[in-house]
Amino acid sequence: MTVLETKRGAGAERRHPRSPLRKKTKYRKADAASAWLLLAPALVLFIVFIIIPTIVSLGLSFYQWDFFDTPAFVGFANFAKLATDSAAWNSLGVTLLFVLLGVIPTIAIGFMLAVLINANMPGVGVLRVLYFVPVVLSVAVSAVLWAFIYDSRQGPIGALLRVFGLPPVDILNTDTLALPALVIMMIWLALPIVIILYLAGLQRVPEDIYAAAALDGAGPWRTLWSITWPNVASTTFVVAILQIVNYVASSLDVSLIMTNGGPLGATTALSLYAYRQAFSNQDVGYASVLSVVQMVIIVAIIGLGRLITRRFSR
Amino acid sequence: MRPARLRIGRYSTIILLGLIIAFPMLYLLSGSLMSFSDIAQYPPRLFPTTPIWENFAQAWSYLTPRTILNTFAFVGSVLLIQLAICLPAGFALSKIKFRGSKVVFGLFLVPVLLPTNLLLIPTFVVTLQLGLIGNFFGLVLPIAGQASVGVLLFRQFFSTLPDGLIDAARIDGANWFRTFYSIALPLARPIIAAYSVVTFLTAWNLYIWPLLAAPGEQTRVLTLALAPLATTQFSNISPSVGFAAAVIAMVPVLVVFVVFQKWFTRGIAGTGLE
């Protein structure tokens, strides 16, 4: 799927699977003991902090619990609560808005920019740094920066509005503007990684395809759309999954720091709503239900995407 | 003649769009040296009239050296633990044939679809039950335990080493630990570098887990100190000082990124599968 994976992975697969040599190998007890010893440290931490929480999350959704008292089994009551909780449905809408507004522009812009800087010209290697550099910013650092950019009194956008004699707009406190403003920052933050992944994907497109297309008289846009884009489909799939997860789950950091879910819940996505239910309302069971819902959404979107891409590639 | 003109057009597009993308960050650097009147000036200035280094002194005392040390300790511990657990595990899964290896491999695939923010609440529950909330172990261990990407990446790498190399060492009488340590590990340097850079960056920038697990003065990391500046910088301190604090928090990652850029892009491309 990626440079490392395919270059090395493909070779490795060819070398061993189901060769006669392998069938002859018997499991040796001494080997097994060594293997488990080498695995043990990773397994212990992984089971305690990933596998058990996953199971706990599913289990707790059937309990009423406040972190401290004994959990009380309530069956499907938490799920029933979800059905009538309009705030939860609003936050589900916010989550979907994050995904809808964020994912496609991130992919489209990232792809175009990667194609642009995938040029074999002297000096481009250095110029690429300009495109990669936002990757070093944490959400916290970029929040400090973008909160200033969006600030109505001191920020550049406010200044621009004043030039045209327009009234100041407090972007992050306007319910229709806050979410798009956060999404713009998230796109900016996500671009370096998307560009890097696409650059890796573009390296694997064989040069002679382009030569053939040029011979057939295809212009640059036609080449881009009919040759380059289909040839990086596997990268697009990976990028899409990463970005869906990014906008469903990582919007939590962004809205927690920049808008605290406001104004009027306009940026309270499911992730933040679940967070509040757990850590402000101490309703751990219900928060677990909301986490399960997010899990289902991610799996459903990815499954749907896979189904669509399969249909189109056949 | 035509290709030359096209080339110039492409160069200028690359430079122009690159500057647009990097602009907010360049402005952050420039703004961190502006005086209050510079940054509030209208129309906005691109460069400070005279650099005010005092901003950094103020930002430094706002952030406190303790917080900076905490961040290094947190990131360093996460990185060392991850390397110490993921490398041997990846080796065992790729080179040793034993019953159960497929099950273990499958187990490490589970979290590939589970973003860590979704496991936040149950991870907090488990860490709380272990009595680790509020201290350094609770901060580090759950993040270090996110080992699946590392294990899968190293497994992938070790499986590209020729079996003959491993067999030769085994026939010479080296046990698995020695084979791992003196044959496989030195060859893994490039992939270790790539994984380390990505892990360093990710851990340095974490916000929510440190907020939940260890928000106290003694254990607080840089992102926790910075976040309030995004909403209160305009009342408490000058935006320039906020910018300076952001720059201080950014410098270590920026250095790592610039020095190890090659490894970083390889690391992203390599872990991108997950």
Roles of regions detected by a PLM:
Chain A
Residues 1-30:
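Short, Lys/Arg-rich, polar N-terminal cytosolic tail immediately upstream
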Residues 31-314:
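A structural signal for multi-pass alpha-helical bundles of membrane permease subunits
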